[in-house]
Structures are given as structure tokens and as C-alpha cells.
Amino acid sequence: MASSFERIERAIVAVTAFVLTILFAPHLENGIVIGVILSLGLFLFRTMEPRFTELSTHDGSTMFMNALDNDLNRCEVVSIVKYSGSLYFANAGYFEDRMLKLIADKHHCLKYIIVDMAGINQIDASGEEMLSGLLDRCSAAGVEILFARMEGIEKVLIRSGFSDKHGKDRFYERRTDALRYAWKELGDEEAASKSPLKHLIS
């Protein structure tokens, strides 16, 4: 459902296009073209920086929430992030930048990033290429990326061969399944016992 702000934006574009169409009469096509350009520009502006959040939970809770907004402790070894929006040519670089910033912020502590993909309903070739390159770069730096809840784009990544190329052990139905896999691979019981997500590991 569109927010009131989005509805206002659309109304402004619609009214502007209508007024321009009238002003350009009898060359109505000029007003229509400008209206289309305004609509495309608004779409690109809104989707260039989608919501990217790191998730965590209250102690003992299984509900993931925005760690920053709720002042929750974050795990320094395994991070869970959520990205909401389409992943395409206009914002693939933004997603990559946010992932690399997360790694830089946690220095050498971070070993796994679990990406909650439930909020991604579309991905194009640019988005897929970015993900593929990001996986390779992060692996070389000692950080592995896992994906969870991929219902919206799973078929696309299977058809393109992305899943086979990068290994099916990167993909999980639930975030907790990916989390348990990460800690099992790490084999660091001491670090796991100190993680704010420790109650989800066992």
C-alpha cells in the first residue's frame, strides 16, 4: 500500500502533466511526453536508495527487528540484514556500497552476512551481476554471504544459473536456518555464546 507521501507525489506528477498537456495544446503529445518523463524520474528517485537495515532481536525473542531503531545489540561475527525493494541497475551500486560499509564497520570480526531477501520482488541482470561479483569479493576477504527467504526472486536466480554457480548451501528458507549453518561452519562456541543471537542458534 502506497504511503500518503507517495500518493501526494503521484498527484503532483499527474496534475503537472495535465496542466502541461493543456498548455502545449494543440501539441498535446509534448505534455504527455513530459508527464511520462516526470513519472520515470520519480520512480528512479524513489527506488535508488531502498531501505537497508541490520536486524537483531531482544534477548529470548524470535522476532527480528531493525537493530538501530530499537537500540538492539548487534552480532559482530554474523550479521543479518534486510533489503526492501527491487534490485536493478539504478540501485545495485547502493546495495553493494551498504554491504561493503557493513564489512568495513565491523573490521575483521565479521565472517558471515545473512541477507533477508523477502523484501526483494524483482532483480535484473545488473542486480544479479552485482551480487555475483560481491560474493566473490567478500569470499576473498574472508566474509561469506548467505541468503534467506528468497521466494520473490528464487525462480529467476535458478533459471539464470546463479544458484548453481555459487552453491545451493548459500540459500535458506528461514533466517534461523542460515544462522545455524553459519555458526556450525565457524565452529566457534565461545563467540556464539557471546552473540546477542545465541538463543536462535541452538
Predicted region positions:
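Intrinsically disordered or compositionally simple regulatory linkers and C-terminal tails
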Residues: 186-202
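Generic detector of well-ordered alpha-helical segments enriched in charged/polar residues
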Residues: 154, 176-179, 183, 198
